[in-house]
A protein has these predicted regions:
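N-terminal targeting signals for export/organelle localization
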Residues: 1-56, 190
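A short beta-strand-turn-helix
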Residues: 56-76
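Short acidic-hydrophobic, aromatic-tinged amphipathic segments that line or gate anion-handling sites
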Residues: 59-60, 134-138
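Short pre-active-site segment immediately N-terminal to redox-active cysteine/selenocysteine motifs
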Residues: 74-76, 81-84, 151
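C-type cytochrome heme c attachment motif
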Residues: 83-90, 154
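Structural microenvironment flanking redox-active thiols in thiol-disulfide oxidoreductases
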Residues: 89-129, 139-145
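Thiol/disulfide oxidoreductase modules built on the thioredoxin-like
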Residues: 124-131, 138-190
Length: 190
């Protein structure tokens, strides 16, 4: 016995609009998750170095005086950058303001490590944008590897006792650096 065609269960066909809506929904959820988990430039991030002794900084000095991080006895911002990096260019005035302010008291300084860039481009960058601090050549990336640099700009704040206390990704501001220093100074004063 067969069922008449009018009583047969209709075959469901997928509609392209349903698939498109599903794909758009999945992509929207993915982008929202990405947005909320990758807030760059506005926060400190964890790293395996935070709480540990800072690695050395080596390489040819391109600008400024030779500097030994192990004998700093003050706060040091170690900044990894390149002249072709847009966020690096954007953060440079903040680093310059921090360096100038703390040069007055001598309690902190900035050093930069070039990441995949040319010495002539770095010289031109500092000549045009200012900044009077020590700049190390990249030493073929060994220093960046020692510090665990994944992308630039990355900055590390090292305490006067040589411990890495914070890591900043995708740019840092003078206010962020000063806030971390103040929080440690407050703890020391308590």
């Amino acid at each position: 016995m067969t069922t008449p065609a009018s009583e047969a269960t209709p075959v469901r066909r997928s509609h392209p609009t349903r698939w498109a809506a599903l794909v758009v929904g999945v992509v929207a959820i993915f982008l929202l998750v990405l947005l909320f988990t990758a807030r760059t430039g506005e926060r400190r991030t964890g790293t395996t170095l935070v709480g540990k002794a800072a690695p050395g900084v080596e390489g040819k000095v391109l600008r400024g005086d030779a500097f030994d991080l192990g004998n700093a006895d003050r706060w040091v911002v170690v900044n990894f950058f390149a002249t072709w990096c847009t966020p690096c260019i954007a953060e440079h005035p903040e680093l310059r303001a921090f360096a100038e302010e703390h040069a007055k008291t001598g309690d902190a300084r900035v050093i930069s490590v070039v990441y995949d860039d040319q010495a002539t481009a770095v010289q031109r960058f500092f000549d045009q944008r200012g900044g009077d601090w020590t700049v190390f050549d990249s030493d073929e990336g060994r220093t960046a590897l020692d510090w665990g640099v994944a992308k630039i700009p990355e900055s590390y704040l090292v305490s006067p006792n040589g411990t890495v206390v914070a890591k900043f990704i995708s740019g840092v501001t003078q206010a962020q650096l000063d806030a971390v220093i103040a929080s440690y100074d407050d703890e020391a004063g308590s």
